[in-house]
Amino acid sequence: MYIADILSDLLTQQTTRYGWIFMVTSIAFSIILLAVGLNVLSQLLFRRPYEPPVVFHWFPIIGSTISYGIDPYKFYFDCRAKYGDIFTFILLGKKVTVYLGLQGNNFILNGKLKDVNAEEIYTNLTTPVFGRDVVYDCPNSKLMEQKKFMKTALTIEAFHSYVTIIQNEVEAYINNCVSFQGESGTVNISKVMAEITIYTASHALQGEEVRENFDSSFAALYHDLDMGFTPINFTFYWAPLPWNRARDHAQRTVARTYMNIIQARREEKRSGENKHDIMWELMRSTYKDGTPVPDREIAHMMIALLMAGQHSSSSTSSWIMLWLAARPDIMEELYEEQLRIFGSEKPFPPLQYEDLSKLQLHQNVLKEVLRLHAPIHSIMRKVKNPMIVPGTKYVIPTSHVLISSPGCTSQDATFFPDPLKWDPHRWDIGSGKVLGNDAVDEKYDYGYGLTSTGASSPYLPFGAGRHRCIGEQFATLQLVTIMATMVRFFRFRNIDGKQGVVKTDYSSLFSMPLAPALIGWEKR
């Protein structure tokens, strides 16, 4: 009792002196301390032997969120060294199971539809941006039909016209861009490539009318849509936050613009003029039940088409230019490759679709950039049924989210010796610097044509399985054409004697160069 009386007197004195601030602070600190203690004890004393090991963390709910968010790849490799290829971490209160390596990629990316689900993970993020009844806001069977409609338009005949459109857009941009006036200067290359990729994609895939709308105001609307892809919107997509209000206004405005273009096309019957673009393909498409694709859904798919491809192409093209600035010798090799193929007479002849496959070093530069800078570092799926992990004792419960990270595999020394070195020549035939990339590429029709199911390759920049990117061929065409055109015009270099490239910004869902990504340029 004596000790209790002393403590009571001390508490009374402190409360009198500092008031309720001291009391509230003491209680809050005690609660936090208790929560941390119970969280640590639960990890040490109540391990579940039939679930993957949980990454140790001090704070409940927060878990490993901060270390994962700062650098996902470092987090994955550190955890793999300690726990193995499969482990679970706490991400804002959710249990997230990561399964790395070839087996992990196959387990998740080729998981059965009844076992894993992408829609429940991404719909809160994508539906406010794209619009209703498309992509992840519809049954998977309908999504497969939508992908088939768009894939049908990506024909070889269309690709021939796309190369000319893209080259002309890049040349027009270079000639008109304030940042490229004069004979030399510096430029924020990420900003430039974001504009070039959206101009080229909108013109090639969606037609001249759409491209004509991409003035500064329309580009600003797409920027507002882009801001809707912030990670916080996985949970707070509904919140009346400033960027969400701007997102919703932009979505309505852009969708209305597309619907006006669609209506004008129907009235003018401009099918022949626009036969190569995806908008026209959707306008004449019909679902399996006989329902024509509604104009509203076409408009929403047009938004999805640009937004989904824009991040990947913008990021990848920026990394290409940054690496060429860091390695001017490789940029000169690219120029020499074009001299060998097209001759030394200037100006070079216009690029043709058939030329792209001859530009082998250009292709290898793209491959090496995608290997080191996969646009998406974490591919997520919701577990719908308990999943047994083959060859282990583990069963993944339905309360977990799964993550596959093909980008980890492409940075694994097992398959790519000296994996963090940027070396386009590792892809040269016979170099011996790419291992395990000769797996048989199995194909399956998920409802939108034969698609690669193979996840056994260590190099999967476009994913695998039913959600594999349908735009791989177009993205390759677009990026190689942009690269070849830029090489014809410029020499790039790092500024201020810097070595290598800028670090990666992981604060968004896509692995972008950390801003500002400045490089020096000089016209040839």
UniProtKB/Swiss-Prot annotation:
Pathway: Steroid biosynthesis; zymosterol biosynthesis; zymosterol from lanosterol: step 1/6
Binding-site residues for heme, renumbered to this chain: 469
Keyword RNA-binding: no
Key words, A-Z: Heme, Iron, Lipid biosynthesis, Lipid metabolism, Membrane, Metal-binding, Monooxygenase, Oxidoreductase, Steroid biosynthesis, Steroid metabolism, Sterol biosynthesis, Sterol metabolism
Matching InterPro entries: CYP450_sterol_14alpha_dmase (IPR050529), Cyt_P450 (IPR001128), Cyt_P450_CS (IPR017972), Cyt_P450_E_grp-IV (IPR002403), Cyt_P450_sf (IPR036396)
Gene Ontology CC annotation, any one: membrane
Matches recorded under Pfam families: p450
Cofactor: heme
Disulfide bonds: none
GO molecular function: heme binding; iron ion binding; sterol 14-demethylase activity
Class of the enzyme per the UniProt entry, highest EC level: oxidoreductase
Gene3D superfamilies: Cytochrome P450 (1.10.630.10)
Catalytic reactions of this protein: a 14alpha-methyl steroid + 3 reduced [NADPH--hemoprotein reductase] + 3 O2 = a Delta(14) steroid + formate + 3 oxidized [NADPH--hemoprotein reductase] + 4 H2O + 4 H(+); a 14alpha-methyl steroid + reduced [NADPH--hemoprotein reductase] + O2 = a 14alpha-hydroxymethyl steroid + oxidized [NADPH--hemoprotein reductase] + H2O + H(+); a 14alpha-hydroxymethyl steroid + reduced [NADPH--hemoprotein reductase] + O2 = a 14alpha-formyl steroid + oxidized [NADPH--hemoprotein reductase] + 2 H2O + H(+); a 14alpha-formyl steroid + reduced [NADPH--hemoprotein reductase] + O2 = a Delta(14) steroid + formate + oxidized [NADPH--hemoprotein reductase] + H2O + 2 H(+)
EC id: 1.14.14.154
Any one GO BP annotation for this protein: sterol biosynthetic process
Subcellular location per the Swiss-Prot or TrEMBL entry: Membrane
Family: Belongs to the cytochrome P450 family.
Function of the molecule: Sterol 14alpha-demethylase that plays a critical role in the third module of ergosterol biosynthesis pathway, being ergosterol the major sterol component in fungal membranes that participates in a variety of functions. The third module or late pathway involves the ergosterol synthesis itself through consecutive reactions that mainly occur in the endoplasmic reticulum (ER) membrane. In filamentous fungi, during the initial step of this module, lanosterol (lanosta-8,24-dien-3beta-ol) can be metabolized to eburicol.
Protein name: Eburicol 14-alpha-demethylase
UniProt organism field: Uncinula necator
